């Protein structure tokens, strides 16, 4: 395990794993919660997120990254900054849960993604519902989705659902076993 990946894993274990009954965004109940906003919005951990996810997706060709607000927003920003630090141009975008009823009435915010190759990201994935919603929205906006990447996969079917439903590769940096969770 390289230093950056190991450092991020330790940050997640120390700051983001919360034990106790919780209801997840998927509606499922769990005995633990991985609150990755404690990582993706943390000044020490967020840069590690960007580096780890760029390394994880290094073989995919994309020039924009984003996903469904809110979980994906700081992940995309971390990747944008990590890419810039490496001398690479990478734009970020935000997918709203619904199009705005005013202004430009856009569902996908940020630089134009029509005709571009994009990576959809998420902080943690349970059923794959949020990334699939984002994939559908960015395809409607005219982008080509090259993959989906998440920081933590809960090993509850997201990988299979995304690969079958969206027809794109699914990557994750850590699984629940690496976090010591059942």
UniProtKB/Swiss-Prot annotation:
Binding residues for 5-phospho-alpha-D-ribose 1-diphosphate: 96-97, 100, 102, 122-130
Pfam families: Pribosyltran
InterPro entries the record matches: OPRT, Or_phspho_trans_dom, PRibTrfase_dom, PRTase-like
GO process terms (BP): 'de novo' UMP biosynthetic process; pyrimidine nucleobase biosynthetic process
Top-level class of the enzyme under EC nomenclature: transferase
Annotated orotate binding sites: 126, 154
Gene3D superfamilies: 3.40.50.2020
Source superkingdom: Bacteria
Keywords, sorted A to Z: Glycosyltransferase, Magnesium, Pyrimidine biosynthesis, Transferase
Its EC number(s): 2.4.2.10
Catalytic activity: orotidine 5'-phosphate + diphosphate = orotate + 5-phospho-alpha-D-ribose 1-diphosphate
Molecular-function annotations in GO: magnesium ion binding; orotate phosphoribosyltransferase activity
Signal sequence bounds: none
HAMAP family, A to Z: PyrE
Function summary: Catalyzes the transfer of a ribosyl phosphate group from 5-phosphoribose 1-diphosphate to orotate, leading to the formation of orotidine monophosphate (OMP).
Self-association state and partner proteins as the record states: Homodimer.
Family as reported in the entry's similarity comment: Belongs to the purine/pyrimidine phosphoribosyltransferase family. PyrE subfamily.
Protein name, UniProt field: Orotate phosphoribosyltransferase
